[in-house]
Amino acid sequence: MSEENNLVAVVRTEFGKGAARRARRDGQVPTVLYGHGEDPRHLNVPARDFARILRAQGTNAILTLDIEGTEQVALTKSVVVHPIRSYIEHADLLVIKKGEKVTIDVHVVVVGDAAAGTMVAQDASTISIEADALHIPEQIEVSVEGLEIGTQILASQLELPAGSVLQADADTLIVNVVAAPTEADLEEGAEAPAADEAAEEA
């Protein structure tokens, strides 16, 4: 585990919205650590360092927490971000151990260019897989290079990293290659609202 993922976590003794606001004002993120039948632990972690790790690894980041001198490895399970100011409001962390399998949602990234005259519609941006807790892929790539109109890629056709197992429905549609709209289609789409407005005014 890289030292860049280390965070010093402070056990919280105050709770409620007021305490959470004070923690954030002091540059901390309120978190809850749970799992393995242990009682949930309420912690604060440094906001700047936590945000840096999430930017580098995504929302499934693995953390090494220093909790009062004891090291604990954890998976970032969920992150709540303020919708306007974009700071991290809260996070849930899951206790993990070496060799353990976890079920997580991983981002699906489309790469390559489909055939000329086509448009790629991505129906699923994430996919649920089971993976080693310490070897979670940052993303799963799906190539559309040269694909023709009518081609579909299902979850069962994704190339998963070694040791990972698909948990989503095998028939989940990931990518659908369709005909790109023509200029006539675009013009017709632009004219329709104008025609509707004219009809309403008549």
Curated annotation (Swiss-Prot):
rRNA-binding found in the keyword field: yes
Sequence similarity: Belongs to the bacterial ribosomal protein bL25 family. CTC subfamily.
GO cellular component: cytosolic large ribosomal subunit
Protein name: Large ribosomal subunit protein bL25
Matches recorded under Pfam families: Ribosomal_L25p, Ribosomal_TL5_C
Keywords assigned by UniProt, alphabetized: Ribonucleoprotein, Ribosomal protein, RNA-binding, rRNA-binding
Gene: rplY
Alphabetical list of InterPro entries matching this protein: Rbsml_bL25/Gln-tRNA_synth_N, Ribosomal_bL25/Gln-tRNA_synth, Ribosomal_bL25_b-dom, Ribosomal_bL25_C, Ribosomal_bL25_long, Ribosomal_L25_dom, Ribosomal_uL5_bac-type
Organism: Rhodococcus erythropolis (strain PR4 / NBRC 100887)
Primary role: This is one of the proteins that binds to the 5S RNA in the ribosome where it forms part of the central protuberance.
Gene3D superfamilies (UniProt xref): Ribosomal protein L25, beta domain, Ribosomal Protein L25, Chain P
Subunit organization: Part of the 50S ribosomal subunit; part of the 5S rRNA/L5/L18/L25 subcomplex. Contacts the 5S rRNA. Binds to the 5S rRNA independently of L5 and L18.
GO biological process, one term: translation
A GO molecular function held by the record: 5S rRNA binding
